[in-house]
Structures are given as structure tokens and as C-alpha cells.
From Swiss-Prot:
Alphabetized UniProt keyword annotations: Ribonucleoprotein, Ribosomal protein, RNA-binding, rRNA-binding
Phylogenetic placement of the source organism: Bacteria, Pseudomonadati, Pseudomonadota, Gammaproteobacteria, Alteromonadales
Main function: Forms part of the ribosomal stalk, playing a central role in the interaction of the ribosome with GTP-bound translation factors.
Family: Belongs to the universal ribosomal protein uL10 family.
GO cellular component, one term: large ribosomal subunit
Source organism of this protein record: Shewanella denitrificans (strain OS217 / ATCC BAA-1090 / DSM 15013)
Keyword Protein transport assigned: no
Matches recorded under Gene3D superfamilies: 3.30.70.1730, 6.10.250.2350
CDD domains: Ribosomal_L10
PANTHER family for this protein: 39S RIBOSOMAL PROTEIN L10, MITOCHONDRIAL
GO BP of this protein: translation
Name the UniProt record assigns to this protein: Large ribosomal subunit protein uL10
Length: 166
């Protein structure tokens, strides 16, 4: 179905607005994926704060112009699904990576984070970023281990001091 110029401008504006507020973006090829599977993906995306849209390549290129995701323009070939993470930088990468495991025809093309292009083979770097709560927990564990280690070293020094005195 042909789109009117007004419709194209609306799509470009919508995707551009999503890109401006996003932390990261992932581009994928959704060719061969069933409608039911895409519906499941979109539902999961909404739950994770990820904006997902299938966009024509020329419209996608225009939408990302002047944003941090301009480096993705070379991946806009064939059917293009673009996902923007709004709440956590790794959310879209994690979502599409997990979706690709269950759908053999779904292929991640690449991602962008802070203006840097990340090829599909390195998508794990972005997908494995800890969430805010996970990062806080890791920091607390590190601090706890540091204080426990300091306590053990203090006890060992006290023991050594008593042995020398005896």
C-alpha cells in the first residue's frame, strides 16, 4: 500500500521523536516471522519500555538523521525493524536477542549506543549491561566484600601481633 506524503512525514516525525528520547537502538530483519510472533514481541517491548517499529529504509534514514543513531543508516537494507530502549540501554538488545533465539528467521543487524555502532556479533555487550537495580546490588556486594576483607585482615594482624607478644 502506497503511503501519502503526510503519512511518511508523520512516520519520520514519530520515529525521530522516539530516537531523540532513546538510550540505545537495535536494528533487525523480521522477514519470515509470523504475525503472532511479532505481536508477542511488541507486547514484550511495551512491558520493557522499548519502542518497536517496522519502518521503510528511506524513512528510517531520514528519521535518525541528526541523532546519536545516525551510524545505523548502513544497516537499513531489506525489511527493517528498529527498536529504541527508553528506560535501560540494554533493554532492546536483550529483548531482540532473546526473541531471535526462538525465531530462526529473525536476524539482528546491529545496534547503536552513545553514537557508536555495535555489530550484530557484539550485541551481547549491550544486552548484558546490568539494569540499575542489578548495578546497585553489584556495588553493594563489592562494598560489603571490601569491608569483610578489611575485617579479616584486621583480625589476622591482631592475631599476628598477639603471637609476637607471646
Amino acid at each position: 500500500m502506497a503511503l501519502r506524503l503526510e503519512d511518511k512525514k508523520a512516520i519520520v516525525a514519530e520515529v525521530n521523536e522516539a530516537a531523540k528520547g532513546a538510550l540505545s537502538a537495535v536494528v533487525a530483519d523480521s522477514r519470515g516471522v509470523t504475525v503472532g510472533a511479532m505481536t508477542v514481541l511488541r507486547k514484550a517491548a511495551r512491558a520493557n519500555g522499548v519502542y518497536v517499529r517496522v519502518v521503510r529504509n528511506t524513512l528510517a534514514k531520514r528519521a535518525v538523521e541528526g541523532t546519536a543513531f545516525e551510524c545505523l543508516a548502513e544497516t537499513f537494507t531489506g525489511p527493517t525493524l528498529i527498536a529504541f530502549s527508553n528506560e535501560h540501554p540494554g533493554a532492546a538488545a536483550r529483548l531482540l536477542k532473546d526473541f531471535a533465539k526462538g525465531n530462526a528467521k529473525f536476524e539482528v543487524k546491529g545496534a547503536a549506543f552513545e553514537g557508536m555502532f555495535i555489530p550484530a556479533v557484539d550485541i551481547d555487550r549491550l544486552a548484558k549491561l546490568p539494569t540499575y537495580d542489578e548495578a546497585l546490588a553489584q556495588l553493594m556486594m563489592t562494598m560489603k566484600e571490601a569491608s569483610a576483607g578489611k575485617f579479616v585482615r584486621t583480625l589476622a594482624a591482631l592475631r599476628d601481633q598477639k603471637q609476637e607478644a607471646a
